[in-house]
């Protein structure tokens, strides 16, 4: 792979020693929201203030990652549903987001009990927990009829997938969001998950194996979880 950067120069594209454009899910979303904001935040790397919502998102995301890294299936296997719920709550920190953790623990308990009843505990923990993937794709000139290119461009895409669950011989990426669910977010979420699908499909087998994933498996479905609204 070539080096990559947000601050690329298309004039240097044919020079193999120069970096190509880097696109992440976040930078793509920022550009769609406001191209000028994207330019300040990514190519210029201007710092932005962290809002309370951003801080909350980081804390809860880290807590969910730690939850799946710590959860012991053998320990919970013989527990009653109420005991599983208490166990799940014990894996979350005690901070200002306890109400959200309670919802997340309830969801985790329901998933565990259902998996146990169906004999699918081997699929309870995600094989991918905060997985960062890298790939290269070629943008064809006619992909966007509103902004046709004069030539194809190879770009580097990168993203961190919150969770990748497995069901039989396929994967299901699941995105965690800490804000409230609104119906207008559905289009945005589909774009985010489609980005992950594109990233997964174009990652090399070696990259997938390094992240504990089977390159022979496909992503057939996707989902998102908004615990603030108890919406999946």
Question: Where in the sequence are the language-model features?
Answer:
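Charged, glycine-rich intrinsically disordered N-terminal tails and low-complexity linkers that flank
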Residues: 1-83
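Sequence-level motif detector for i,i+2 pairs with an aromatic at +2
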Residues: 23-26, 35, 123-130, 134, ...
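Intrinsically disordered, low-complexity boundary segments flanking structured domains
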Residues: 26, 110-122, 177, 202-213
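Active-site oxyanion-binding pockets that recognize sulfate/phosphate
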Residues: 50, 95, 182-186
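Hydrophobic (often cysteine-bearing) scaffold residues that line and stabilize catalytic clefts
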Residues: 52, 56, 101, 189-192
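A non-catalytic, helix-rich entry segment at domain boundaries
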Residues: 59-147
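Mg2+/Mn2+-dependent nuclease catalytic core
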Residues: 131-232
């Amino acid at each position: 792979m070539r080096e990559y950067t947000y601050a690329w120069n298309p004039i240097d594209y044919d020079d193999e020693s120069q970096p190509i454009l880097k696109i992440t899910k976040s930078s793509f979303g920022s550009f769609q929201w406001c191209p000028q904001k994207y330019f300040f935040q990514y190519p210029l790397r201007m710092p932005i203030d962290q809002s309370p919502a951003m801080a909350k998102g980081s804390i809860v995301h880290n807590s969910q990652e730690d939850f799946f890294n710590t959860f012991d299936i053998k320990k919970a296997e013989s527990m009653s549903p109420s005991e599983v719920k208490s166990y799940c709550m014990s894996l979350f920190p005690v901070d200002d987001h306890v109400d959200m953790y309670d919802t997340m623990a309830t969801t985790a308990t329901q998933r565990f009990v259902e998996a146990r009843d169906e004999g699918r505990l081997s699929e309870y923990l995600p094989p991918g927990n905060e997985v960062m993937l890298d790939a290269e794709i070629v943008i064809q000139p006619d992909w966007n009829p509103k902004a046709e290119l004069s030539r194809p461009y190879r770009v580097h895409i990168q993203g961190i997938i919150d969770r990748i669950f497995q069901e039989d011989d396929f994967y299901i990426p699941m995105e965690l969001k800490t804000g409230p669910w609104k119906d207008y977010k559905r289009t945005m979420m589909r774009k985010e998950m489609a980005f992950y699908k594109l990233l997964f499909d174009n990652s090399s087998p070696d990259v997938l194996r390094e992240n504990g994933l089977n390159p022979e498996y496909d992503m057939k479905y996707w989902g998102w979880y908004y615990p603030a609204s108890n919406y999946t």
